[in-house]
């Protein structure tokens, strides 16, 4: 069996730019790409916490340490500057690989600087 598991996520990043006339993508601060292991041109899912929009695009690198999270092209129509988003990437793997796999979870502050990282999500309580 082939499974698709969460590979990485950037949790509650703040959209800094929305560029409708730029070639489609999401530009992400290079430090965040490195911390998550998301590769340039990799497909990512965007979940807008502010307005509920959900869509996919591909990642491109923004300047390291810039805090840039820029939705470009058609994706810019789904967000506004200041929206909080989750950026997620998934990876395919076998059931055996999935048994030991741990995702790279990156949590950011209001300026999109890394506040902490983890490899698991706490159990949700009632």
Swiss-Prot record:
One of its GO terms (molecular function) is aspartate 1-decarboxylase activity. Substrate binds at residues 57, 73-75. Gene3D superfamilies: 2.40.40.20. Its EC number is 4.1.1.11. It catalyses: L-aspartate + H(+) = beta-alanine + CO2. SUPFAM superfamilies: ADC-like. Is synthesized initially as an inactive proenzyme, which is activated by self-cleavage at a specific serine bond to produce a beta-subunit with a hydroxyl group at its C-terminus and an alpha-subunit with a pyruvoyl group at its N-terminus. Its cofactor is pyruvate. GO terms for cellular component: cytosol. Binds 1 pyruvoyl group covalently per subunit. Pathway: Cofactor biosynthesis; (R)-pantothenate biosynthesis; beta-alanine from L-aspartate: step 1/1. It is an enzyme of class 4 (lyase). InterPro entries: Asp_de-COase-like_dom_sf (IPR009010), Asp_decarbox (IPR003190). Keywords: Autocatalytic cleavage, Cytoplasm, Decarboxylase, Lyase, Pantothenate biosynthesis, Pyruvate, Schiff base, Zymogen. The keyword Metal-binding does not apply. The active site is at 25 (schiff-base intermediate with substrate), 58 (proton donor). Disulfide bonds: none annotated. Heterooctamer of four alpha and four beta subunits. Belongs to the PanD family. This is Aspartate 1-decarboxylase. It comes from Xanthomonas campestris pv. campestris (strain B100). The lineage of its organism: Bacteria, Pseudomonadati, Pseudomonadota, Gammaproteobacteria, Lysobacterales.
